[in-house]
Design a protein with these regions (language model features):
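Hydrophobic-ligand binding "helix-grip"
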Residues: 64-65, 205, 209
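Generic structural signal for short, solvent-exposed loop/turn connectors between secondary structure elements
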Residues: 34-46, 60-66, 125-132
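Core segments of cupin and vicinal oxygen chelate
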Residues: 8-53, 107, 139-192
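N-terminal/domain-start segments enriched in small and hydrophobic, helix-friendly residues
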Residues: 1-11, 50-53, 59, 66-74, ...
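Fold-core signature of tandem repeat domains
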Residues: 25, 71-75, 112, 159, ...
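Short hydrophobic/aromatic beta-strand micro-patches
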Residues: 9, 74-76, 139, 214-216
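Residues that flank catalytic or metal-binding motifs in active/ligand-binding sites
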Residues: 45, 69, 132, 183, ...
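Vicinal oxygen chelate
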Residues: 2, 31, 58-60, 81, ...
């Protein structure tokens, strides 16, 4: 499992969406399914999928949050035909944010919002070796526009095996974007590729809990470290969730939690659920005690 994985919050379509995405992205699969009972959202389905080699968690937890393009997933394709095939599937019931076609940076590219509202950028790079097929991309808008570079450097200071890669900046004449801010930047955290950008255009959206980043931890010391470095909004601290100073949502979770939630013993799962619903930062020993009963 990657150190950092993406968590997608659906109203009630997590299982349906998991089937859809694993059918669209060839060679993908559903890894695990579980249901957590007696949460504030009622019975909650959790589905773990592997898409093009990367893990995603999908949850059905009510209509509290909506996906928006502040976070999108860049899919790097081997051929232009693969771009077209993915576009044809993801565009069913969706809408184009940037039309499929040729651009100065790619012979074949398009940005699509699928039928669930999730944003995908599909791109073909000729002659380039592909190390990671899906790259989570952060767009800094409105109150955090112009802070993409600051945020990228901050994240690189928090995580290990991290560095900032290529940076493309806006030039004079590309208003409303400010000269020198980030047009596109690649960066690596825990050996995983990410991307970031600023956009000063008018947007009616921002980062929210519909997409959060899960940090998987082995020990309480790890949990304490990431929680202390990332959390910037005490009001957002709940059930392992936090919000950083840029508005991005994270979950700092113990690895053992996934195994607890897959347990066939409903009483054990219920005890763990009751315990973690009362927590802000996860207490690993308290979760183990609840599990043991």
């Amino acid at each position: 499992m990657e150190k950092i994985t993406s968590h997608l919050w659906f109203d009630k379509e997590a299982r349906e969406a998991a089937e859809f995405y694993t059918s669209v992205f060839k060679g993908s699969r559903i890894k695990d399914t579980a249901t957590i009972s007696n949460t504030p959202s009622g019975d909650t389905d959790i589905v773990t999928v592997e898409l093009l080699g990367q893990e995603f968690t999908l949850i059905s937890a009510g209509p509290l949050f909506k996906f928006n393009p502040s976070i999108s997933f860049l899919v790097v394709c081997n051929t232009k035909e693969e771009v077209d095939a993915l576009w044809n599937e993801l565009s069913k019931g969706g809408k184009a944010l940037m039309d499929l076609g040729a651009y100065p940076f790619s012979e074949r590219y398009g940005w699509i919002q699928d039928k669930y509202g999730l944003s995908w950028q599909l791109i073909f790079f000729s002659g380039r070796a592909i190390r990671q097929r899906i790259v989570l991309t952060l767009m800094f808008v409105d109150r955090v526009v112009g802070r993409a570079e600051e945020a990228i450097n901050f994240y690189a200071s928090v995580f290990r095996n991290a560095f900032v890669g290529d940076i493309q900046r806006y030039r004079k004449g590309e208003e409303p974007d400010v000269e020198g801010t980030i047009k596109h930047a690649s960066f690596t955290l825990e050996g995983q590729q990410f991307a970031g950008m600023d956009s000063a255009r008018e947007h009616n959206f921002a980062f929210n809990e519909a997409i959060s980043l899960m940090v998987h931890c082995e020990t309480q010391e790890e949990i304490d470290y990431y929680w202390g470095r990332l959390s910037a909004d005490p009001k957002a601290e709940q059930c392992g969730w936090l919000r950083d100073k840029y508005g991005l949502s994270w979950q700092v979770v113990p690895n053992i939690m996934a195994e607890m939630m897959k347990d066939k013993d409903e009483k054990r799962k219920a005890r763990v659920t009751e315990a973690f619903l009362k927590m802000k930062k996860f207490d690993l020993e308290a979760l183990k005690r609840a599990y043991r009963g």
